[in-house]
């Protein structure tokens, strides 16, 4: 019996019918706290990694090797005043930052950390993740409109167009995973990658979806960078034109909530990419399967997050027309064509996804 099963059994015996509700709240709280800690140290890792790429040290003053820098940043933002523009729509202005964070947290309800370790093991998990993650764009539009600033509104309109453009390609990439796995349940999608010729010979990583669905994996990940408005797709907050875009009139914790949502969404995109294309909690080789699955998932997510940061430090920002062209004229045709190719592949004698 695992530790979680032991706690669950003991709690049920102690609290009776109230235990399921208490246990659900405890799990949600634990996941939320872990995500917040991950965001704090992801920001530190980003600053450190970019510093090394620029041949400098990065944060190294607060705590040993700068490890307490995230705590100092949080305290600074908590103590700053939230200044509201006089012409802003008061309630909408305050609701927008909260509305952008809530969907980012809500997606984690269906992401499995390892076998049987998921907050809500629903059969439509992939559909839920796609739907919830799309809500964030409304918060961005709301922030741009409520600020009553032409620069904020311009940034919000850019965000809306960019997110809609890349969500279509991302959706087709996920349709490919659905076709091959035959399920919307994220745990079952991971399970579908654990069989095949290579997995049968102990080389698990060659049976994962990244290899047969490589174009879809690339499209999904790059679209994820665009969806999160990360460099080089950060025209929403283009510093040289509209400064911080929809966040230009926000300060203090209201401003920090937008950044919190951005980094949570980065982790969500990486976790979904690892789950859908990189085998989730599955070990790359069978002889390493004794290591707990959550270790492999965290390692894959960390590697993908490092790619996010590497892209930021390497590529110049695209023009807005280039971003639209990439989404509509490159990614969309590639994913549609690959859906057709995989469809014929699955109907042929060479079908590698036979259940």
From Swiss-Prot:
It comes from the Bacteria. PANTHER family: NADH DEHYDROGENASE SUBUNIT 1, NADH-UBIQUINONE OXIDOREDUCTASE CHAIN 1. GO terms for biological process: aerobic respiration. The gene is nuoH. It catalyses: a quinone + NADH + 5 H(+)(in) = a quinol + NAD(+) + 4 H(+)(out). Its main location: membrane. Keywords: Cell inner membrane, Cell membrane, Membrane, NAD, Quinone, Translocase, Transmembrane, Transmembrane helix, Ubiquinone. NDH-1 shuttles electrons from NADH, via FMN and iron-sulfur (Fe-S) centers, to quinones in the respiratory chain. The immediate electron acceptor for the enzyme in this species is believed to be ubiquinone. Couples the redox reaction to proton translocation (for every two electrons transferred, four hydrogen ions are translocated across the cytoplasmic membrane), and thus conserves the redox energy in a proton gradient. This subunit may bind ubiquinone. This is NADH-quinone oxidoreductase subunit H. The keyword NAD applies.
